[in-house]
Amino acid sequence: MEIDELTALGGLLHDIGKPVQRAGLYSGDHSTQGARFLRDLAENTGRAEYELLSLFSEFHHKGHMKNDELMIRRIKELSPERFGLTMEDVLNALWIVYEADNLASGEREEGQPQASRPLYSVFNPGKAYPWAELDFEKELPVPGDVFSIRSQDYRELVKRLWEELSKAKLRSDRLLPVLEKYLTFVSSVTSEGNIISLYDHMRMTSAIALAMLRAGCTAEDVRSGRCRKEKRFLLIEGDFSGIQDFIYRVSGKGTLKYLRARSAYLELIGWDVVLEILSRLGLTRANVVFNAGGHFMIIAQNTPDAVKELEEIRAKAVEWLYREFESDLYLAIEWEPVSGREFGREGGKNLFAEARKRLKHKLTVRKLKRFGEIKGLFEHGHTERLAECPVCGRELPEGKLEPSASDPETKVCPTCNRLVSLGGNLPKLLGFGRTAKNDAGVLVEGPFSGFVPYLQGGRPVGEQILVKNTLNPGEIPESAQFVPYFVADYFKKDPKGGVATFEELSMASTGTRRLGVMKGDVDRLGEFFSSMDSPSKLATASRFMDYFFKGYIGAIIEGKFGYIIGDVPSLRDWPEEPDIVVVYAGGDDFFIVGAWDQIFELAFRVRRAFNAYTGGKLTLSVGLGYFDERTPIYRMADVVSERLDTAKDEGRNRVFVVGRSRPLDGKHKLSYEWNHYEELWRTYAPRIYAGNGRLKGKLESKKGLLWKLLEIRELYVRDPNDVRWAYLTAYLLGRHGLSDLFPELVGIDTKAVERKEPQPVYWVDGVLKIVLMAVRR
């Protein structure tokens, strides 16, 4: 066993005693019980390494570290030489993990610890979770009034953990998913209101410990405080820009497959860069604080060699991106030296947030110098005749275009051709093998590696195997690194099992034949993340956020969690196989297409689920659009992006439901606050809409009346001070004997006038237009 492996694994397992103690399996504090658990595991499995790792549980608190004689005696008893280690190696590793434990969360048992206390929500610390395995196929983890976790729940947890640790290969890449599965909903400490998942604390301890080791820290450095005071660490951040242009600026046949392929390809490019950084700097996946939405952060060592490697990685990645996509897609990579103390708070200051703020400034400056890493960027590069790729619009030498894999009569660029194949394979993929670019079977390439599809029934190849939507390594070779990655990949199947087309989705609509498009993201997320005051808190928050969109969106689309979501605005019974395709969902945003009426309803389903998931503390804004299926996707993306921006600008926590007009002064809002729209729907829809594309009662033969109401609303929009609209509404409804349908629209709402708010007639179009689309024949 190498010293770096010992340190990384020691960090991962140092707090294993916490669930063991709460299960009441042994006696003593959690350090003692964790050590006994690992020693028993070693004896039961015959893996002596677990006995060596038990030292990291036994010696990771200040009181234990003072007893040098005991520590040295315990190390000698285990004969570190048989593991290829020296006494000094193990002693240094123990002190490093001890310090990393302190730095990872700044957490210690404060107040009155209580073993049964649950993990509180990072979004709403007033609510907590029951213990459960992390399983996206089961329940949506909703925080609530949970006051304790039963010891029998912990016993069941420890039993399952024992079983999997007994079988898992003793390597960071294999232990991380086991710990994530069972310790995500376990509190790292049992003091009141703790929001840090034990899994995230343990992996951040491992990350910081390995970075300390790589930075040359020793036991003496820890004792003297040098590793805490000196800038021995790097916070590395990468952020893609131009994502929307990269994904949506495509056209031609099979556009939806292209979109999904480009979204998946972007994910692979990001992983290629992240894994290259980890490989060259000698780190593990635990060092990745987050990697979501084209944005990643890594904790590393601050050494000249590490900085040199990062400079080379950045230059090569940016040059490759420019060569492949010209200026469409850019990756800014920066790093900030930090000391150990800057992983937390000090004197009331959030030093961790301040360090991240400095890093963010560096990233902003680098984005302003976009592609400045490339020498000779503006030198004339082509003398040959140029031709345009009909899919992505890039210009490149005519001779480099090649017959499309899906339509040999059309010539496309090599990248789009590979993405045609990727799009066709995505429904069958279990993941990808990361390997050398010139290896057989490479389908797409990143800046540093090639990716070979891992198909059902096939054998994965590559040094690292990225496996989709599972924490189980399955059949991948033991020699390969296991990289679980999660992706929201729900799609409506066409008759051949592939991805449905825009035409097929729009044809499944109720009423008018339209394609619905939804774009949304989380409000004020930057403010939320800026409050995080430790790597472990940031890791917990970003992981929980990312998993809502990558892990649970698919289940929401499938109609699950109805008991949480409740009744939402709906035009038809929710289908068993919704006519919806997720183009992208992850990080804090999503872009989804489908039958327009299902997309309309899905927006409210997602919002309700997200509200429950975050304990009611965070909000979403969404822009909706309904288009002819022949509309270019980039135009659809532009429209819903503008509508999302409008919802944000008008106060956030809002939905732009449908295109609307407003008075020229621009003071009236175009979007709706979610609760307001749901209230309007509950008020008006049951009076006029029978469901599944039919109007109610006598309105079935008087559809024109609803159109007339929309015309009257336009009178109000032209001049809100002119009251003719009120008289015309009263006359119209009275003439048809329907005044009881819209009593709110008859007359002038004086309270709205006093509050300087629009009259009810201004808001009614958001319901009427949707209903009229649903009943159109």
UniProtKB/Swiss-Prot annotation:
It comes from Thermococcus onnurineus (strain NA1). The keyword ATP-binding applies. Its cofactor is a divalent metal cation. Residues 1-106 form the HD domain. Belongs to the CRISPR-associated Cas10/Csm1 family. It comes from the Archaea. Encoded in a type III-A CRISPR locus. Keywords: Antiviral defense, ATP-binding, Endonuclease, Exonuclease, Hydrolase, Nuclease, Nucleotide-binding, Transferase. The N-terminal HD domain has ssDNase activity. The C-terminal GGDEF domain has the cOA synthesis activity. Its EC number is 3.1.-.-, 2.7.7.-. Signal peptide: none annotated. Residues 513-660 form the GGDEF domain. This is CRISPR system single-strand-specific deoxyribonuclease Cas10/Csm1 (subtype III-A). GO terms for molecular function: ATP binding; endonuclease activity; exonuclease activity; identical protein binding; transferase activity. CRISPR (clustered regularly interspaced short palindromic repeat) is an adaptive immune system that provides protection against mobile genetic elements (viruses, transposable elements and conjugative plasmids). CRISPR clusters contain spacers, sequences complementary to antecedent mobile elements, and target invading nucleic acids. CRISPR clusters are transcribed and processed into CRISPR RNA (crRNA). One of its GO terms (biological process) is defense response to virus. Pfam families: Cas10-Cmr2_palm2, Csm1_B, HD. Probably part of the Csm effector complex, that includes Cas10, Csm2, Csm3, Csm4, Csm5 and mature crRNA. Will form a homodimer in solution, interacts with Csm4, which is a tighter, better association than the homodimeric Cas10 and uses the same interface for interaction. Ni(2+) and Mn(2+), but not Mg(2+), Ca(2+), Zn(2+), Co(2+), or Cu(2+), is required for ssDNase activity. ssDNase activity is inhibited by EDTA.
